[in-house]
Swiss-Prot record:
Catalyzes the interconversion of L-alanine and D-alanine. May also act on other amino acids. It catalyses: L-alanine = D-alanine. The modification N6-(pyridoxal phosphate)lysine is found at K40. Belongs to the alanine racemase family. It comes from Streptococcus pneumoniae (strain Hungary19A-6). This is Alanine racemase. One of its GO terms (biological process) is peptidoglycan biosynthetic process. InterPro entries: Ala_racemase, Ala_racemase/Decarboxylase_C, Ala_racemase_C, Ala_racemase_N, Ala_racemase_pyridoxalP-BS, PLP-binding_barrel. The active site is at K40, Y263. Substrate binds at R136, M310. Keywords: Isomerase, Pyridoxal phosphate. Its EC number is 5.1.1.1.
């Protein structure tokens, strides 16, 4: 989907806020801890290349989901280490060596498939992924980890790191978190030779479990100023949201009592009302379940009336406003603010999803 710069809908990305968040988090973790910036999924909707370029001097490396995201960074001139967090296709090994990526190894079957195809592994760098309880990818048994490490090293692979991912670091109860931590520590203790980098701290762990940090952290959601727990846990220190979502009024009219709005005619005015149209819809990631949520116009909350369409929403105004008047969907307007977490709560989801779903049709503007 191509960006649509000739309409007023845009996402404003405060790169300085992201840098400040990295510095804030860095000030609260052990000195010497490596900082890996997670810029997968287009940097959580903020723009991977622009964000990575802005923060490259503040971090020690980057994490992405797949090899295509990694190639995008390299082709944009980013030279710092890039760890691919997901499982890569066998054919990606040659690309990883060519572009100097670090791959994740999550199972013996993957290694054996490479050996069966006689793939040249010499010079490849990898991190071993441990499934300590997340249940997605990773080794579960210490014996498998030892076997994998031996096989890889025998074939010229540099096993640089080992890591895991916590499922409940952003929740009130620490019980499952502690169980995962112990499983991970048990596997580490069983290894004959511990890799150079050991990391288990995602944003939530970095914020609320700083005492469990090994020697690297993966900064994701929090780097963009979002609370990984939503509204469950208070942040231990201030973070600055980096993304503002804005549009403008493109049509304003007064309708009589009884007038209906949107598909299905689900909203009917109970009196004469001022209705405005805003050019954003579910094709932009402003999903259909946002009906009845309020956006901000002139510092006032204005409800979305009628269903969210693919490209447009209709809102009820307290009075007529000129065409071009700013509409804030995420961010501050006057003395009011709408946060990504508030949007997520309304949708019964998480703030990660809210920002990641903002489609490429919305131009990103950086400052």
């Amino acid at each position: 989907m191509k960006a649509s710069p000739h309409r007023p809908t845009k996402a404003l990305i405060h790169l300085g806020a992201i840098r400040q968040n990295i510095q804030q988090m860095g000030a609260h973790i052990p000195q010497g801890t490596l900082k890996l910036a997670v810029v997968k999924a287009n940097a959580y909707g903020h723009g991977a290349v622009a964000v990575a370029k802005a923060i490259q001097d503040d971090v020690d490396g980057f994490c992405v989901s797949n090899i295509d995201e990694a190639i995008e960074l390299r082709q944009a001139g980013l030279s710092k280490p890039i760890l691919i967090l997901g499982v890569s296709e066998i054919e990606a090994v040659a690309l990883a060596k060519e572009y100097d990526f670090t791959l994740t190894v999550a199972g013996l079957e993957w290694i054996q498939a490479l050996l069966d195809k006689e793939v040249d592994l010499t010079g490849l760098t990898v991190h071993l992924k441990i499934d300590s309880g997340m249940g997605r990818i990773g080794f579960r048994e210490a014996s498998e980890v030892e076997q994998a490490q031996d096989l890889l090293q025998q074939h010229g692979v540099r096993v640089e790191g080992i890591f895991t991912h916590f499922a409940t670091a952003d929740e009130e109860s620490d019980d499952y978190f502690n169980a995962q931590l112990e499983r991970f520590k048990t596997i580490l203790a069983s290894m004959k030779c511990l890799p150079e980098l050991v990391h288990a701290s995602n944003s939530a762990t970095t914020l609320w479990h700083v005492e469990t940090i090994f020697n690297a952290v993966r900064m994701g959601d929090a780097m963009y100023g979002l609370n990984p727990s939503g509204a469950v846990l208070d942040l231990p220190y201030d973070l600055i949201p980096a993304l503002t979502l804005e549009s403008a009024l493109v049509h304003v009219k007064t309708v009589p009592a009884g007038a209906c709005m949107g598909y299905g005619a689900t909203y009917q005015a109970d009196s004469e009302q001022v209705i405005a149209t805003v050019p954003i819809g579910y094709a932009d990631g402003w999903t259909r379940d946002m009906q009845n949520f309020s956006v901000l116009v002139d510092g006032q909350a204005c409800p979305i009336v009628g269903r969210v369409s693919m490209d447009q929403i209709t809102i009820r105004l307290p009075k007529p406003y000129p065409l071009g008047t700013k509409v804030t969907l995420i961010g501050s307007n006057g003395d009011k603010e709408i946060t990504a977490t508030q949007v997520a709560t309304y949708r019964v989801t998480i703030n990660y999803e809210v920002v990641c779903l903002l489609s490429d049709r919305i131009p990103r503007e950086y400052y």
